């Protein structure tokens, strides 16, 4: 367990260091934004898999309260990400976007995010061809 905590702390530290490097040109800014969006897609997929595991009886028994915290953070992450995408897409403020996301169910939010990132992945794949 100690090794897991140390490894998680190191990963978080390296991620923070990588995110803190300033981009110097427009090309580098575009690359950084693309990397962040791809990382967000990977986060969304990982958290979706994580949310699916919450239904397993043995998982709930094994992790207990820690699992509830992780699941709660995943839901908050999904809501924030959906609000950010809506604000950017529709050109509205963050608060207005959050007001649009609030009445949505957890399933609707996940479907919205998967559609959004699915379209982006398809566009990037078609550009490479």
Curated annotation (Swiss-Prot):
Keyword annotations of the record: Antibiotic, Antimicrobial, Cytolysis, Hemolysis, Secreted, Signal, Toxin
Signal peptide as annotated in the record: 1-20
Tissue: Expressed by the venom gland.
Superkingdom of origin: Eukaryota
A GO cellular-component term linked to this record: extracellular region
Propeptide intervals in chain numbering: 21-60
Record's keyword annotation contains Signal: yes
A single BP term in Gene Ontology: killing of cells of another organism
Location of this chain's protein in the cell: Secreted
Main location: secreted
Family membership noted in the UniProt record: Belongs to the cationic peptide 06 (cytoinsectotoxin) family.
Protein name: M-zodatoxin-Lt8l
Gene name of the encoded protein: cit 1-12
